[in-house]
Amino acid sequence: MAASVMLSSVTLKPAGFTVEKMSARGLPSLTRASPSSFRIVASGVKKIKTDKPFGVNGSMDLRDGVDASGRKGKGYGVYKFVDKYGANVDGYSPIYNEDEWSASGDVYKGGVTGLAIWAVTLAGILAGGALLVYNTSALAQ
């Protein structure tokens, strides 16, 4: 009973909302001095050198002059940056390079040595897997 009398005499007052800037030692500050202190500057256009640019240059063969989405072609295709960057778009990461692929596809360009390396690698992976299975089984006990 005395506790209920004591609680009824206590009144709660709303406290004002204040924001204090707290800084902890050893932690970096997340505030910046001024928003214009950070600036990104490009170093300029760097042209790559290729003997011959990869990819198609100049035009695209579109059926009825319309691409798959129904838009009319503009005549320069995807690969239009040979003058600006020194190579076509595909020159940076060519999908097909004649120096790496066989002309007919009948012969592996790596030769017998490449096939031997491939076979040894595959055999090593399979033998390693078999060894792991054996070591974790009851047969190894």
Curated annotation (Swiss-Prot):
Transmembrane segments: none
Modified residues (Phosphoserine): 59
FT transit peptide: 1-42
Record's keyword annotation contains Thylakoid: yes
Family classification: Belongs to the psbR family.
PANTHER family, per database record: PHOTOSYSTEM II 10 KDA POLYPEPTIDE, CHLOROPLASTIC
Protein name (database record): Photosystem II 10 kDa polypeptide, chloroplastic
Taxonomic source organism: Brassica campestris (Field mustard)
Gene it is expressed from: PSBR
